């Protein structure tokens, strides 16, 4: 193996002529040269570089260079300053005996050292600190250290120090104090604030030791508790900052500002090191998400994360306690969710919240580039749904109050009769067997309810528009949602609480109408309820690349069509009667039943396929749906013919068709 060696400044330069077997690597050119003499050398040269050098030179000296100290008497080298000091103390005492007094201000060497420290660690604050040392009775090798500012002597902070720490600090203040190991008298010294250590060593006293302070003093001590855990005495919850625990007590426990200090308990952090520094850097609670505890750099990033990720929760009233309890509503006021939901909408409609023409939100003073972005912001952040007719809000406040009441009104579970669900194109819309059977039982009651509503419809056309809207609102809610079963018939979703169903209804409401959102394929007439179905359809049927999908995906939301609930229910009613007439021949009503046959569910389930590389689908020319097997496609085409020739007369003459015959 060839020898890889670099030249040294003092070595004799062999050029490899005597040793042809080994190849020497050419050395670093500065190491081959003799040292250049400059006007200043040693520490003076470094000080001059920090005083008048470039930014790059300062960076090299601070970050990329290690210092080796050389004793001028014995030429010994030391990599650390403490080793050099110990060496000079015991083996090579300095040539000039220094007295114990402070150095003269006019001394050039001390002035140069001060300039060096000022250049490396520029002091932002010139405030002085007072250090008080108190002896410990049980331990003679350590003292209590109290640090306070001269401008505010009330704020006294306490930290314990190790013997090495106390020795260094006492040597700086006076040499006589360092010779006595047990400290008997308390001494007060005025020192300059160190750059980092004092800030991290500061810890706040407990609530018993600290006197009552003003609100300004409370705000200044927000970030001084990095080494301690703050505990709420009422619920024993831990916090990292005083601001977080004060906000928690004020919002959750409803305590006044004057009583906050009584409910805060301070406990030392167990993972704190011996010098008082915390091992883990604690992120302030105000910059972390209260739901998922993810930390961010700024509060604006926390708000943006909360609006986009946790969009179902209210940002202004959310707290970690309420967010983690599953059954408790997210409102801080102790009122029912239905009432609070209603009052919130009424309160929001009492004044102008937005300006559609200027695309500006008047609640948080934000301006947006388009009305779509403003509507999205109002729906996600403020939970206000805007429609095209909502721009008249500012002109007629009375009408807005009525319309908001109509929009929010939820019928009680006792008075609402449930009706069967509606079926759309989405293949995930198949029902569980229990839900399907339950809703088949409720079908006659729902149709009786429909007959009653039809008989009352002439009365609903009264001169007052608000009353008419209220009358027509009830059947729409009951047609799309089952408040007894807590079930959305449009999405086939079951909810655990009435509040969750109420929040879900907001997603289906636009002004005074209930709609169902459909995503449409931009290349054909295919449309579905789910966005991922459109993406799958474009990939499998139209054979488009992922690059094309990246362009199309953003516009799918804009192309989405909001169809009213009547359109969805009527569409299912057209598809269903031919099957329901055969199955329920004893029913007295004509084909208005919305419950479909299981045959159509099976046909829709057949379109869900697993795509592989060696795979070809059978596509329908009429609607663009693709099927894995040809039998599924032929069966699907029969449904098109059945829908085209669907009439009451044809249904009577037609025989009963079963699933086994259809699939043969």
Swiss-Prot record:
Record GO terms (molecular function)? DNA binding; DNA-binding transcription factor activity; zinc ion binding
Would the keyword Aminoacyl-tRNA synthetase turn up in this protein's UniProt record?
Answer: no
Q: Which SMART domains does the protein's record reference? A: ZnF_C2H2
As stated in the Swiss-Prot or TrEMBL entry, residues carrying the post-translational modification Phosphothreonine are 319
Specify the taxonomic lineage: Eukaryota, Metazoa, Chordata, Craniata, Vertebrata
Listed PROSITE patterns? ZINC_FINGER_C2H2_1, ZINC_FINGER_C2H2_2
Q: Where is the composition biased (Polar residues)?
A: 154-179, 207-224, 416-436, 458-470
SUPFAM superfamilies, per database record: beta-beta-alpha zinc fingers (SSF57667)
**Subcellular location as annotated:** Nucleus
Entry protein name: Zinc finger protein 800
- The superkingdom of the source organism is Eukaryota
- Stated role: May be involved in transcriptional regulation.
- Bias class Basic and acidic residues marks the residues at 577-591
Glycyl lysine isopeptide (Lys-Gly) (interchain with G-Cter in SUMO1) cross-link located where?
A: 409
* Placement of covalent cross-link Glycyl lysine isopeptide (Lys-Gly) (interchain with G-Cter in SUMO2): 132, 279, 392, 409, 476, 599
The entry assigns this protein to a family as follows:
Belongs to the krueppel C2H2-type zinc-finger protein family.
From which residue to which do the C2H2-type zinc fingers run? 69-91, 230-253, 287-310, 357-382, 486-508, 519-542, 618-640
Instruction: Give the start-end ranges of region Disordered.
Output: 154-224, 328-349, 388-476, 574-599, 635-664
Q: Among the record's GO biological process terms, what is one?
A: acinar cell differentiation
- Which gene name does the record give? ZNF800
A GO CC term assigned to this protein in UniProt: nucleus
Q: Which residues carry this modification: Phosphoserine?
A: 317, 336, 422, 426, 455, 457, 460, 462
């Amino acid at each position: 193996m060839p020898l890889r060696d670099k030249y040294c400044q003092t070595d004799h330069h062999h050029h490899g002529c005597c040793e042809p077997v080994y190849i020497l690597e050419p050395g670093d050119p500065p190491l081959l040269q003799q040292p250049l003499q400059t006007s200043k050398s040693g520490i003076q040269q470094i000080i001059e570089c920090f005083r008048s050098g470039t930014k790059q030179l300062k960076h090299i000296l601070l970050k990329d260079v290690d210092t080796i100290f050389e004793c001028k008497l014995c030429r010994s080298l030391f990599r650390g300053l403490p080793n050099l000091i110990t060496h000079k103390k015991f083996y090579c005492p300095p040539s000039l005996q220094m007295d114990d007094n402070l150095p003269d201000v006019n001394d050039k060497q001390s002035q140069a050292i001060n300039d060096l420290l000022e250049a490396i660690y520029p002091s932002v604050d010139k405030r002085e600190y007072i250090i008080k040392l108190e002896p410990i009775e049980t331990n003679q090798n350590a003292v209590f250290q109290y640090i306070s500012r001269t401008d505010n002597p009330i704020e006294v902070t306490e930290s314990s120090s190790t013997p090495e720490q106390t020795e260094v600090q006492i040597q700086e203040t006076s040499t006589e104090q360092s010779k006595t190991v047990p400290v008997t008298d308390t001494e007060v010294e005025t020192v300059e604030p160190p750059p980092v250590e004092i800030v991290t060593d500061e810890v706040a006293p407990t609530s018993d030791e600290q006197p009552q302070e003003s609100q300004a003093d409370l705000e200044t001590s927000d970030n001084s508790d990095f080494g301690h855990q703050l505990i709420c005495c009422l619920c024993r919850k831990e916090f990292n900052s005083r601001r977080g625990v004060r906000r928690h007590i004020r919002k959750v426990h409803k305590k006044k500002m004057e009583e906050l200090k009584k409910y805060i308990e301070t406990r030392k952090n167990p993972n704190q090191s011996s010098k008082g520094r915390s091992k883990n850097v604690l992120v302030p609670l105000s910059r972390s998400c209260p739901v998922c505890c993810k930390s961010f750099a700024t509060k604006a990033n926390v708000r943006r994360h909360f609006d986009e990720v946790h969009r179902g929760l209210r940002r202004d009233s959310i707290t970690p306690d309420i967010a983690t309890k599953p059954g408790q509503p997210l409102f801080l006021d102790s009122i029912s969710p239905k009432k609070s939901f209603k009052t919130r909408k009424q309160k929001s409609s009492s004044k102008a919240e937005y300006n559609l023409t200027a695309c500006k939100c008047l609640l948080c003073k934000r301006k947006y580039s388009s009305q779509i972005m403003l509507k999205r912001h109002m729906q996600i952040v403020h939970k206000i749904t805007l429609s095209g007719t909502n721009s008249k809000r500012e002109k007629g406040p009375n009408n807005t109050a009525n319309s908001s009441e109509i929009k929010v009104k939820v019928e009680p579970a006792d008075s609402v009769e449930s009706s069967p669900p509606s079926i759309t194109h989405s293949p995930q819309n198949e029902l569980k067997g229990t839900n399907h059977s339950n809703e088949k039982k409720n079908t006659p009651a729902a149709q009786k309810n429909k007959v009653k509503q039809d008989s009352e419809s002439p009365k609903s056309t009264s001169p007052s528009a608000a009353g008419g809207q209220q009358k027509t609102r009830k059947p729409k809610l009951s047609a799309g949602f089952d408040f007894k079963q807590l079930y959305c018939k449009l999405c086939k979703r079951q909810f655990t609480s009435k509040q969750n169903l109420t929040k879900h209804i907001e997603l289906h409401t636009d002004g005074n109408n209930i709609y169902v959102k459909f995503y449409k394929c931009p290349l054909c007439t295919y449309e579905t309820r789910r966005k991922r179905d459109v993406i799958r359809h474009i990939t499998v049927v139209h054979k488009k690349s992922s690059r094309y999908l990246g362009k199309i995906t953003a516009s799918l939301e804009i192309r989405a069509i909001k169809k009213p609930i009547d359109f969805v229910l009527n569409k299912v009613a057209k598809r269903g009667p031919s099957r329901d007439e055969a199955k329920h021949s004893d029913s007295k009503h004509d084909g208005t039943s919305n419950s479909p046959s299981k045959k159509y569910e099976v046909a829709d389930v057949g379109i869900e396929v697993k795509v592989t590389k060696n795979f070809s689908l059978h596509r329908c020319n009429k609607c663009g749906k693709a099927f894995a097997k040809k039998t599924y496609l032929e069966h699907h085409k029969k449904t098109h013919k059945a829908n085209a020739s669907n009439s009451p007369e044809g249904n009577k003459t037609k025989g009963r068709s079963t699933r086994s015959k259809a699939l043969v």
